[in-house]
Amino acid sequence: MNSPHIFEELDFQKTPLGEISLRKRTEPRLDNLLIYEVKLGDDFLMSSLFVEAEEQLSELALKRLKLNGHSHELNVVVGGLGLGYTALTALNDMAVARRRTIDVMQPVISWHQQGLLPVGDVLASDARSELIHGDFFEIAIDQSEGILEQQKVHAILLDIDHSPSHWLNQENSSFYNLESLRRMKRKIVDGGVFGLWSNERPDPEFTKLLDQVFSHTEEHIVSFANPYSGGESINSVYIATV
C-alpha cells in the first residue's frame, strides 16, 4: 500500500529578510519520501533531500583540524543553522566538545527547539550544543581577538549565503573581502580552520582571496544525485587553515 501524500506548512513567520516558511511533504516521484523544505519569500532556501555538502562542510573541516594536530576538546562555531545538518555532523564527532550555531532568524532556531525538524531534538538537547540568535557576520568581524565570550575557537564554519558572490542579503557582501576575513581569522587558533559551503563550483577569485589570508586553502567539489534533473548536482566546500 502506498504511503499517504503529505503536504503541511509547519510554520510561517515574517523576518527582516522576508517571509520564511517551513513545510514538510512527501515526494511522489521518490516513493513518497518525506522531505522538509524552507522557503524565503518565493525562493527555496534548503531541502532535506540535498544535505550532502552541508555534512561535508563539517566532516572536511574536522578532518583538516585533526591533520593539523587538533584532535580533542574542539570548539566549533557554525554560522547559519538552516535544517541543522552542518551542526549535527559536527556533534556526531565526539572530538567536538562545544558547538555553537549562530542564526539571525529566530524562527529557524525555534523550529529546532520545538522539535519541528528531524534533527532539532539533538541540537536542542545535546549538552555540547548551543543555538544563538544573532548576526554571524557582525560577530565574526568585530574588533575582538575571540568570538563569543572573547574566546578563540578551532573552527568557524559558514553556511549562510548561496556562494561568496551570491548573497542571501546584500549586506552580507561586506564579509567577503580581505579586511573582514583577516578580522575573522584572529578568532581562530593556530592550525584551526575556516570552512565555507557554496551552492556553486569553486570560485578561483575567492580562493585567491583566501590564499592571501590563510596559510593553506583547499577546494572540495561535492557531487550528489539530483532525482529531479536525473543527473548530478555540484556544490563546493572551501577549507582554509590558519
Summary of predicted features, one role per range:
Residues 1-64, 92:
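Rossmann-like AdoMet
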Residues 14, 200-242:
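Class I S-adenosyl-L-methionine
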Residues 16, 32, 103, 231-234:
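A short, structural micro-pattern
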Residues 20, 36, 129, 237-238:
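A broad, low-specificity signal marking well-ordered, structured residues that form hydrophobic/aromatic
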Residues 43, 161, 199:
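Histidine- and/or cysteine-centered catalytic micro-motif in compact active-site loops
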Residues 47, 84, 204:
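Loop/helix-junction capping segments adjacent to catalytic residues or to phosphate/diphosphate-binding pockets
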Residues 51-187, 217-223, 229-231:
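The AdoMet/dcAdoMet-binding core of the Class I SAM-like
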Residues 191-198:
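Conserved beta-strand signature within the Rossmann-like core of class I S-adenosyl-L-methionine
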